[in-house]
Curated annotation (Swiss-Prot):
It comes from Shewanella sp. (strain W3-18-1). UDP-N-acetyl-alpha-D-glucosamine binds at residues 8-11, 22, 73, 78-79, 100-102, 137, 151, 166, 224, 330, 348, 363, 374. It is an enzyme of class 2 (transferase). In the N-terminal section; belongs to the N-acetylglucosamine-1-phosphate uridyltransferase family. In the C-terminal section; belongs to the transferase hexapeptide repeat family. The keyword Acyltransferase applies. It comes from the Bacteria. Residues 248-454 are annotated as: N-acetyltransferase. One of its GO terms (molecular function) is magnesium ion binding. Residues 227-247 are annotated as: Linker. This is Bifunctional protein GlmU.
Amino acid sequence: MALNVVILAAGKGTRMRSDLPKVLHPIAHKSMVQHVIDTAHSIGSDAIQLVYGYGADKLQASLGEQQLNWVLQAEQLGTGHAVAQASPYIADNDTVLILYGDVPLIQASTLEALLAARPENGVAILTVNLANPTGYGRIVREQGKVVGIIEQKDANPEQLLINEINTGIMAVPGKQLKTWLSRLSNNNAQGEYYLTDIIAMAHADGVAIDTAQPQSAIEVEGANNRVQLAQLERAYQAREAEKLMLAGANLRDPHRIDIRGEVTVGMDVMIDINVIFEGKVILGNNVTIGAGAILIDCEIADGAEIKPYSIIEGAKLGVAASAGPFARLRPGAELKQDAHIGNFVEVKKAIIGVGSKAGHLAYLGDAIIGDGVNIGAGTITCNYDGANKHLTVIEDNVFVGSDTQLVAPVTIGKGATLGAGSTITRDVGENELVITRVKQKHLLDWKRPVKIKK
């Protein structure tokens, strides 16, 4: 029996006050609907039907080439009408799981529990008990068994007292679903085709109906405006921060961290406030991340330290290496064991050898730097000739004086010393001292020009 997931994502989201389709608004740098798609894949879905309408071009541009079947809902006539558009793509023996593109925090474990709760050839509904159920459809039971769902606007005073609400998420057998969808009517206060009406049909047909509930109600909350979107963002961040702490990270303040990707941490990791993680980030044991740092698609080995306000993107730090404060490591940067990149140093597509240091105010691009090298302040690898990038090689134990320019392609041999202020345009041999600065001149009794008053 195949698992066929239908994701409803056709709405405009007028209350967002945006040209962007509602489901494309982001949670943690990823659209709400992408969160739902990823969760659907994670539970082993065999097919995903994405029901779309408003903003089709933007949806397709955002979601790109994924394993999705695009199903158009030209008119938004209710949830039942939306699911009905996917009927041609549903086999009789499918288990159909219905999800919503604006409910991004639903967890795989909850959906697995819902599927497990579905009786054979029956229906399972995800429900939540709320202290204030206003605005939601109510679960109607008789002698404990579900017999229907009544929408808020159609409920009588007695039904309005029910606090078990419908989340809209349900698992339904394919053959019966298609039959029930064909029998839906829009004879209700909204004039819409309610998906929820199939529950009363299931009861009337003698089909077993069971329910499951999420671990937290926040999983099934949607975002209809930017206030609710921000609330979901904070809930997501709190959940991700908790995962990090349980995995061995110490967060100075769990409320001041942004996780916008996949973060893996070792033991005894220390993360200060206002740190942002994006993409895939791996932190080893005893790693320290300073306040305000931004880490994007990088790997930080045991004992390494990222000091405050550094940006680490597409880079690797070896054991006990350090960067910052205010350092920038760009894609292709790699710091070997005990290497140090200090404040206002930028490294791009360069390897910094074991124990090598660039303490401050330098640019190291397209370079291979050996072990035990000292890079003075103001050093620049001049890697670009206006058309192509060229490589600078600095071998082991080289001392580069401050304010040195290395015009690539160039190689500096082992143990060489480059005097401060030099511009190096040719290869330097091992253990050589090279100084290229202009000879200092002294003009005695020099008189400065005098300003002329206007």
